[in-house]
């Protein structure tokens, strides 16, 4: 029985190939748990894989670079601090997205805009952000251009999710991430706030929200009704700290990023949202540290909703 139990656990830990950023930089971990690729790299908040297999990621929180994986060569870059009118301005980039037409969407915090640039670095679309209290480090976390063409923005500092109409640039939907207790400083499980990190528009029209230091995942309707939630200690043996990434898999499961949770807690958790059963966890604190803020599953790259 003991042998069977260990075998099952090994299977559970070997379900996905992962690209992530940890304490030693970028890394790919295969389904057997082996690190098959790595590259020294500074901290990130967003990461993508292109159809050609190249990795697109932030560098120094202000530049987007495309990395050819085989030789680790940077083959394209865009520097938000030096291009298109931003010279000398305080700004950070926490989110970007490669688009189907080859352009790249970039959210520039501090100067308060979303831009789409072509591969020559020319702006082809610009949208002004609405921010209550602007700060380069807090204006945004993840931003996505969703299926209807609009932008869905997690405004960390404001504690709000806003949807911007692509054509007019106007905010057409806002959700205030709730506070259910007094704020508490820090980044770990004892911290508390409503500093949202991510928002994903689901196929049913609802929005799935990673509440950051609120330790919670919410599904809300367009009318802002909470219809599903996962709280900090709801899963047996798991404590959420700063909930970062959300990835909705083709089978409907959710993969949740659990940053700053400390030793003994998983960096990623996959659940069946209907039953809230834990399907898989990635617990590699010793190898990757306490600041894994973004990752993606390579085995469903291009098929998941993130």
Question: Model-found features: residue ranges?
Answer:
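Histidine-/acidic-rich catalytic cores in large beta-rich domains
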Residues: 15-306
């Amino acid at each position: 029985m003991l042998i069977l139990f260990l075998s099952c656990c090994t299977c559970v830990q070997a379900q996905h190939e992962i690209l992530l950023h940890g304490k030693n930089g970028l890394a790919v971990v295969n389904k057997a748990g082996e690190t098959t690729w790595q590259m020294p790299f500074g901290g990130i908040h967003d990461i993508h894989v292109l159809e050609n297999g190249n990795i697109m990621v932030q560098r120094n929180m202000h530049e987007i670079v495309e990395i050819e994986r085989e030789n680790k060569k940077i083959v394209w870059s865009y520097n938000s601090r030096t291009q298109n009118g931003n010279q000398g301005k305080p700004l950070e980039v926490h989110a970007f997205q490669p688009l189907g037409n080859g352009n790249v969407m970039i959210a520039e915090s501090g100067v308060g805009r979303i831009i789409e640039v072509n591969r020559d670095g020319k702006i082809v679309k610009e949208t002004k952000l609405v921010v209550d209290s602007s700060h380069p480090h807090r204006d945004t976390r993840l931003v996505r251009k969703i299926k209807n063409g609009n932008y869905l923005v997690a405004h960390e500092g404001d504690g709000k999710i806003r949807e911007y109409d692509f054509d007019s640039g106007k905010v057409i939907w806002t959700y205030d991430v709730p506070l259910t207790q007094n704020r508490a400083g820090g980044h770990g499980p004892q911290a508390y706030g409503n500093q949202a990190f991510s928002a994903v528009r689901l196929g049913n029209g609802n929005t799935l929200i990673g509440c950051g230091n609120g330790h919670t995942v919410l599904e809300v309707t367009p009318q802002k009704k909470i219809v599903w939630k996962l709280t900090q200690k709801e899963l047996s043996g798991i404590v959420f700290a700063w909930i970062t990434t959300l990835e909705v898999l083709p089978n409907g499961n959710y993969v949740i990023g659990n940053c700053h949770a400390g030793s003994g807690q998983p960096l990623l958790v996959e659940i069946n949202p209907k039953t809230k059963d834990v399907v898989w966890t990635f617990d590699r604190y010793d190898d990757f540290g306490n600041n894994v803020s973004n990752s993606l599953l390579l085995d469903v790259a291009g098929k998941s909703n993130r």
